[in-house]
Amino acid sequence: MKQRIIHIIIMLMAACTMTAQTTVSGTVTDGKESLAGVNVFIIGTIDGCLTDSLGRFSFETTQTGELTLRATCLGFEDYTLTTHQHSNLHLKMHERATAIDEVVVAASSYHFGKSDNFKTMDALDVVMAGNSCGDIVAALQSLPGTQKVGENGKLYVRGGESDECQTFVNGMHVLMPYSTNTENNAVRGRFSPFLFKGINFSLGGYGGEYGQALSSVLPMETTDVAPSDKLGVSASLVDWNIGGTKAFAKSSLSFNSALTSMGLYDAISPDRYDWTRPYRKLSGEAQYKSELSAASIVKTYVGYDLTSVGQNIADRQLSLCEHNIYANATLKTNIGRGYTLFTGIANSSVINDIDDALIHGDHYHNFRNEIHLKAEVRKVFSPSVKMSAGAEDYLRHSTKQYDANGYDLDYNLLAAHVDAQLRVVPRLFLSLSARAEQASYDGQWLLMPRMTWSYVPNKRFQLSAIVGRYSQVAEDDYIALRGKRLQQSTADHAILSMQYATAKMLLRIEPYFKKYHHLPLLTDGTYTADGYGSSKGFDVYGECRSLAKNLNATISYSFNDSERLYRDYTSPTTPDYTSRHNLRLTLKYGIGKVIFGLADSYASGRRFATGTTPYYNSLDANLTWLVSPKIIVYSSLNNILGRTNVFRYNADGSAVTANRDRFFYIGIFVSLKSNKAYDISNF
């Protein structure tokens, strides 16, 4: 028995010895250097191994004849080789090219929150910093490229007027994104930051989808369908809010109402002005969002603001009342074969009535309305090609009456665009777009080509170059006075952007140049399109999170040199709203549930016919206390040192300053549901 077992073992060993053992060996490189950790194996078997630190591999197999090898490695394209050779193999792998949808070109744009292609900073971090006091516009003014114009608080970008920056909600235009106020008092943005999952601020060089903005665009994307019910309140010395959401299976309905009143604050801390009626704003908003399918979503929004204020000015009692209504509805759906369709409609209406506007006993009335229609088709054809094309129409109506003088103006703007984003080679990307626009009152078509080259060698570094042409119609007053024969203004942008980013720091440097053509110019008592101008400079933005634990520091600096011949200027002059130097330093430090913030803002003096203003400086502090997941207390003190900043000079040489040197704000956010306080989101 034992002998039989021994014979069987000997026969099995002989059979194994007779089976051919083949050694497969070689090296793996990327064409320049050896690659370690590459998985090399024979397809259809378990035979294989990982390459060593020198890129070498060697394993045995029972396979004979022709072999099909595959090599896989993170960040590289899979490599397949069919060969009869078993040794001294040389496998050359290629780095996996980034798909066009995976690239986020940061050139001349800043992104907050989450949008279709961006995921960076939460909107709460942006708003609860510095002196923003919950205002998107004030928060964005901390970025490089923006100018400090304290007497109205609007966005001025890279030497451009405030109306050269246009706002879009879900891709649809907003005619008037600001609240109103009396002269020399700062306004606020009329939208809550908590409405949006993405705030994407472009300082210039934007694509063909957007138009009618000579300098910049501010596209904001509202949140999607809410997954749960929400209810929350917030209160401060100047405003009171309540907002909530009812969530359904595949849809949600939201509301928000707010009352802003300076009456209590003015009673506690009077300012320099004589108010006959304190500033008050009553606003309400509602949203309905529905997921029709996995690839289709409908979003609707409607908002209404009523603003009222009265002020004693010299020998008159100015009384202002404004109604501002904005509504939009959009549909985004997959229409098959990889195509995505976007359609939208928006309506903006603004009604202004002012008594004692300029002199005692006069009356000013202005009604503006805009209907915006838009359709766009998008498709990703391959990892290297992405395209979109669309058309839109702006239908505008404006009436103005000042005592016996006035006008009634109607016109529309047609536009079409085509955009293509291409991956030229693995690290080089090209964005091409063309936009054509026509104003009905002159019938002239404008063709505006735009191009962006982006070199993205790795996740840390980006280098981009942007050129493009942009257009915008003049203000309604100028079009009406010219008898609807005023050519559109245009601006040519050239931008170079360099960005280096790691987990601990960010550095961005952007030189730019803008050339303006056909600006409105007062000539012989009427307006022509013979004005021109230029704006050049550079922006620097740095952020560091490694100075100390829980400490975040930022610095933004802008240099701008602008010159224009427009409006009633008699020679090319630096516009009075621009300052040559703008600098802002911020620090944010967290200890447990408390976050401290400190910001110092500086702007050089602005030039006026009656002189140059002193430099602007404001040291601001804020504190956020996360009392619990449902309660947040936020406070801020602006201009701690109490410096009296001069914003500009009147024609008689008198200085225009803020209505108060310091402003203190304290507010509380409370969630009445199970979600976190900052999720009440005014929705």
Whereabouts are the PLM-identified features?
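Short, acidic Ser/Thr/Gly-rich low-complexity loop/linker segments typical of extracellular
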Residues: 46-56
